[in-house]
Amino acid sequence: MKQFIDFIPLFLFFIVYKIDPRVVDLAGHEVTLGGIYSATAVLIISSLVVYGALFISQRKLEKSQWLTLIACLVFGSLTLAFHSETFLKWKAPVVNWLFALAFIGSHFVGDRLLIKRIMGHALTLPDPVWTRLNIAWIAFFLFCGAANLFVAFTFQSIWVDFKVFGSLGMTVLFLVGQGIYLSRHLHDADPTTPKTED
């Protein structure tokens, strides 16, 4: 479920982006809705609201959520400040590649792979399976970053659509594939190994 919370601001961004540009009165102020810049403002505000609500309810945010929020604030603010959507186009590639870097780093730093730190409380798997799973996430994030970058700078007319629905589609497909893979290997785990409950 956590993976899909990140898409709430993106969906709002998409809706505002698709609105035909218009000027509306908001609390006595004229505000332009529609297009990339008002959509970017909505993305920033909705991200602050969503992650702020999560922080209040959970008393913390995951590191991945902090990264997503900070990237949204930085790239979104640069987009508005310089009136250039180029900055926003780089957000998804940079975030995905930073995630990939974190998973890569866990092969060399720490006593457990990152995917095992994330999912180890719920699953008991042989170490080779954890390794393959971690590598799969690295490949996924590298591919998502490259795909977002390619579409953003090659297909101007559809990059926002891809940013939202392409990313969501790739995430769903990957999670389904991961589930199928895990279902084949859960029985390989040592049944005597205790599993920590939530």
UniProtKB/Swiss-Prot annotation:
Its main location: membrane. One of its GO terms (cellular component) is plasma membrane. Keywords: Cell inner membrane, Cell membrane, Membrane, Transmembrane, Transmembrane helix. It is a multi-pass membrane protein. The chain crosses the membrane at residues 4-24, 36-56, 67-87, 90-110, 135-155, 162-182. Pfam families: IspA. It is found in: Cell inner membrane. It comes from the Bacteria. NCBIfam families: ispZ, PRK00259.1-3, PRK00259.1-5. Plays a role in cell envelope biogenesis, maintenance of cell envelope integrity and membrane homeostasis. HAMAP family: YciB. Belongs to the YciB family. This is Inner membrane-spanning protein YciB. It comes from Pseudomonas fluorescens (strain ATCC BAA-477 / NRRL B-23932 / Pf-5).
